[in-house]
Structure formats: C-alpha cells, structure tokens
A protein has these predicted regions:
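Glycine-rich, aromatic-bearing surface loops/beta-hairpins
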Residues: 132-139, 153-154
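Short, highly charged C-terminal tails/helix-capping segments
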Residues: 145-160
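A short acidic-to-branched-hydrophobic micro-motif
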Residues: 53-72
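A generic structural signal for beta-strand entry/edge sites
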Residues: 39-41, 59-63, 104-108
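Charge-rich, low-complexity N-terminal segments
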Residues: 1-57
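Glycine-rich and polybasic anion-binding loops at the starts of cofactor/ligand-binding domains
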Residues: 111, 139-144, 150
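Short, internal acidic amphipathic alpha-helical interface segments
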Residues: 68-112
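A short acidic/glycine-rich loop-to-helix N-cap element
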Residues: 117-130
C-alpha cells in the first residue's frame, strides 16, 4: 500500500482509514465488494440484502448502509414502517433506521451504521466496525421486513 503515512506493523495502532483501506479490509475478510464510484462508494450483497459502503465528502465518516427497496406504495406503507423504524431506533443504538420515498412513489428502508474515522482506526477496530455494520444492518432490515409482514399482511419477501 502506497500511502502518505506510516502503516503500523501491529493490528492495534490506529491509522487513517480511507476508502481503499476499507475495500481491502472487506475483501480480506472474505467478502466480495464491487466499487461503484472509485475512491467513494462500493456495493455488496450480504444475506440477500444490498449494502452500500461509502465515505462522506470530507472523508471522515464511514457509512455501511443496508437497503430494502420495497415495491410498497409509500403513501400506504410509510406510517407502519416509520413506526417500525422508530421502534428500532428507540431500542437499539446501531444502525439508524429510516424510510425514504423513491421517485416512483415506493418506500425504501435504510439501516445506516456510521463510524467516525477522524482519529484513525486500528486493523482490529476497522474489522469490528465492518462486521458490526453488516450484522446490525442485516438484523435491522430483517426486523423491518418482519414487522411489515405483520402490519401490512405481506409475504416473506416483503411484497404484497
């Protein structure tokens, strides 16, 4: 790795966590990851749930975001799924779950695990953050899908 800082020889000393390091770490963990926008964003699918791995514009905050882009009409589904997201956020610290309406009028649900990397992360911390982002993202999306199934009378796929 050709970087403008010293990379420690141990796994516990923090050092800058940039996009390339995150992608390399995810791949070293045995996961496939496709770069969507060089230096900014990558995508993967874990347990049939799409994820976006990205940094904010300043390169400080790492986001590991799980997505459920349902085909549910936002107008009818949003109250139930907003309440579900609110319940999750009250009971769990991570990830933050929220809903958004697509341009087509369907409802999307997002579970965003954010890590402040300003002071750097050790290799151990980075692996833990990635693992936590993936596992809690999967749990959050599954929670919302199960709740939607009950509240809206959907099948297991989360579709009407």
């Amino acid at each position: 790795m050709n970087v403008p800082y010293v990379v420690p020889e141990d796994e516990v000393t923090p050092y800058p966590a940039d996009f390339e390091r995150v992608v390399q770490t995810v791949r070293e963990m045995g996961y496939a990851l496709d770069v969507i926008e060089k230096g900014r964003a990558a995508g993967a699918i874990f347990d049939e749930i799409p994820f976006l791995v990205s940094f904010d514009a300043a390169g400080r905050f790492l986001s590991i975001r799980a997505l459920w882009e349902s085909d549910l009409p936002a107008e009818s589904a949003e109250p139930a799924l907003f309440a579900t997201a609110d319940n999750w956020n009250r009971e769990k610290y991570f990830p933050t779950v929220y809903t958004a309406t697509s341009p087509e009028g369907t409802l999307g649900v997002y579970a965003d695990f954010v890590v402040d990397t300003e002071t750097g992360l050790s290799d151990v911390q980075l692996r833990d953050a990635i693992s936590s982002g993936i596992s809690t993202g999967i749990a959050a999306i599954q929670y919302v899908k199960e709740s939607a199934s009950e509240a809206l009378g959907l099948g297991e796929s989360g579709r009407e």
